[in-house]
């Protein structure tokens, strides 16, 4: 390629990467900004040397302009030292974007991810939508580094999405939208025009699917998937059939924040960019310098009003009816804990009172997950896991963050995905 063509190509890529954002975003009212500042501080102060480094948190910190420089440095160094062989494609993609947002060279991580994705194929048509989440993140990260080399992978991904009949989860659809929007904006000069048509068609299908999950109060899917969905709907070049009211969504999210719904650092990491008017497409444009905002003090932002101290009763059931598992059971216990206690306290009290409720946990980027109850453990090969429900509704938070109410019936159900 001639030097002039190469230069023009890169200029057009840069321009495309920063333009085409539709005016479908909204901002936090100034008088509500202290609540957002408080969330950001809570997320940043959760970073410790002993925890697994979470690239999603570093991305959110950098997009929002970090307050805690020490936490930023710690996460950056931890992610730079991470072994690519230990990471899934999705984790590797997030690590690349996190390091890029910290103005660090991801090094060989990019070529490793590129090689992994060149051999990517869906496990089978009709596979669960979650199997597209990691590849979508990978295409997003690779697109931001070299869209020309990513084009064949993205084309194969888009065609596969068009063949997929089952609806996507909001999270998967949102990340796929961000990935294909990046490719749509950065189609290399001289490429066939039908590539843009393909990405546009795939985006239309996905954003229409997301728009069908918009509830009357503006929440998209659930409150924890709304952050990624807001990013997707604010940048997609394809308008969804169902109109999205960004201000209504923002109003409801702020109301949920005031009620203390966002306490998990990972949940904050996914909503914070939208609260700051940013998306993952902004990662390459993050500037790094010595000037940073002065962090607000703890007295500068409000906190949710604590509940009164009293005991509540929680009805807790553990259930395993899966065929092929040796031990079948359905056992219920009533547990008394202090009002405002998290679900983990209920599990601990049930375990103390009855050995059948013995459980084990595993630490993930979303916090603790229950991996085993009554000696029945999750199994990736068999696609089994413990799902927690309130009545018949799956919980949107983990056991270390969900706060049950008086006489709520919580069920831990061993099931398959």
Curated annotation (Swiss-Prot):
Glycan-bearing residues: 209, 311, 330, 413
UniProt entry keywords in alphabetical sequence: Cobalt, Cobalt transport, Disulfide bond, Glycoprotein, Ion transport, Phosphoprotein, Secreted, Signal, Transport
Residue positions binding cob(II)alamin: 171, 222, 270, 365-370, 386-395
Cellular location(s): Secreted
Modified residues annotated as Phosphoserine in this record: 191
InterPro entries hit by this protein: Cbl-bd_prot (IPR002157), Cobalamin_Transport (IPR051588)
PTM notes: The N-terminus is blocked.
Signal sequence segment: 1-18
Coiled coil: none
A Pfam family hit: Cobalamin_bind
Phosphoprotein found in the keyword field: yes
One annotated Gene Ontology cellular component of this protein: endosome
Principal location class: secreted
GO biological process terms held by the UniProt record: cobalamin transport; cobalt ion transport
Function field: Promotes absorption of the essential vitamin cobalamin (Cbl) in the ileum. After interaction with CUBN, the CBLIF-cobalamin complex is internalized via receptor-mediated endocytosis.
Protein name: Cobalamin binding intrinsic factor
Organism: Rattus norvegicus
Gene that produces this protein: Cblif
